[in-house]
Amino acid sequence: SEGGIAGVGVAEWVSGATETVSEETVSTLVGGEDPSQRERMGDMMYRATSPFGRKGAAVEAISAVDVAFWDIAGKEADKRVYELLGGPVTDEIPCYASNLHPVDHEKLEREALEYVEAGFDTMKMRFLHGPEAGRKGMRENEALVETVRDAVGDDIAIAADAYMGWSVRYAKKMLDRLERYDLAWVEEPVIPDDIDGYADI
């Protein structure tokens, strides 16, 4: 900012592409501009990066700059950013353990129990298999969920992430098999663009 305040913004999943978009496109747009003009700058960045697509590196770069603008605003006002956004709306923010990556059933069970001991009442695991693994993969996915459910009991919420690896047909079959385990949610069974697929599921 003109007052010498630096804002910090972070892009997750940083890749060479994100760095390139940040340095060669986004930074050239916002350099010397008024960081309090967040909406105008956001619109400018969004338009300038449209040839790069509306997902991935371009949006990550824009997001990092937007966060930095908010960081500057908070520092200038001597307030936390959440106060600038209207203040707290709750006394607590729910969180969950999100690192249950199946390697084998014993390790998965041990990790799940460690999360319970650490005080988590919700945890998310990953599936190992998609349609290419056929019925055997379905059985193994179910067995992994069963391992976690048996380990933590019914009072702990379990979610699971397919990371866009399923087809609609496979997802519907898999979700039918998993219904008895009372999962809190199944994340990204198909790609985000498949709106009709999500409606079908």
Predicted regions and their residues:
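Metal- or metallocofactor-binding catalytic centers and their adjacent structured scaffolds
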Residues: 2-76
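Generic secondary-structure boundary/loop-capping signal
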Residues: 27, 42, 49, 62, ...
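Short, well-ordered coil loops that connect the C-terminus of an alpha-helix to the N-terminus
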Residues: 32, 79, 87, 154-155, ...
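Secondary-structure boundary/capping residues
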Residues: 35, 54, 82, 90, ...
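Generic structural signal for individual residues within well-ordered alpha-helical segments
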Residues: 39-42, 85, 109, 172
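Glycine-rich, aromatic-flanked loop segments that form ligand/cofactor-binding clefts
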Residues: 66-102
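Metal-dependent enolase-superfamily TIM-barrel catalytic cores that perform enediolate-based chemistry
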Residues: 92-200
